[in-house]
Amino acid sequence: MKVLQCWDDGVVSDIRLIEILKKYNATATFNLCIGKNGEDREVVGQFEEVDIVSLKRSELYDLYKDFDVANHSLTHPFLSSLSYEEVHHEVAQNKAQLETVFHREIKGFCYPFGSALLLKSVEPFPSPVIYSFMVIRTVV
C-alpha cells in the first residue's frame, strides 16, 4: 500500500498550498472535479464559516502542471446515488476534460466524499476508464 498526500476539489486555497509544497520540494496529488471549475471563481461551500472558492478553469493548468492530477468525478456527487450510466458519465467525462486541460493521461481516481465504501460496488467503471491508482478512503 502507498500513502499519498492528496488535496481535493480545485479551490483557491490551493494557491498558497502549492507555494508551500514547492518551497519544501514536496509532492502531492490534486483530485479535481473540472465541472466545478467554471469561467469565474465562485463560492462552492463553507468550512468553519470560511468560504470555499473554486478556481477558474483557466487557472488549473498553470497552478497544477507540476503536480499529479487525479480524477475526482465531474461534479462531486454521491456516486452511490447514481445509476451505473451516470457514474460512468461523471468519471469518463471528467477524465477526458482533465486530459484535455493538462495534455497528459490522468492515471488516478479519488472517490468523492472520500470513500469507495459508499458505493454498492468498488468497480463501477467499464473500460476504457482504467486507472493506475485509486484512493478508496481518506483520513481527515
Segments predicted by a language model, with ranges:
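Short, flexible/disordered intra-domain loops and linkers
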Residues: 39-51, 116-125
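Short, charged, surface-exposed secondary-structure boundary motifs
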Residues: 21, 39-43, 82
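Catalytic domains of cell-wall/extracellular-matrix polysaccharide-remodeling enzymes
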Residues: 13-16, 76-140
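Conserved, mostly hydrophobic/aromatic
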Residues: 8, 21, 30, 72, ...
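Structural preference for beta-strand elements that scaffold enzyme active sites
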Residues: 2-4, 27-29, 66-70, 106-108, ...
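The substrate-binding groove and active-site-proximal loops of carbohydrate-active enzymes
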Residues: 1-10, 44-50, 76-83, 112-114
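A short alpha/beta connector and helix-capping loop motif
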Residues: 15-36
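Acidic (Asp/Glu)-rich catalytic clusters
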Residues: 18-25, 49-71, 98-100, 129-130
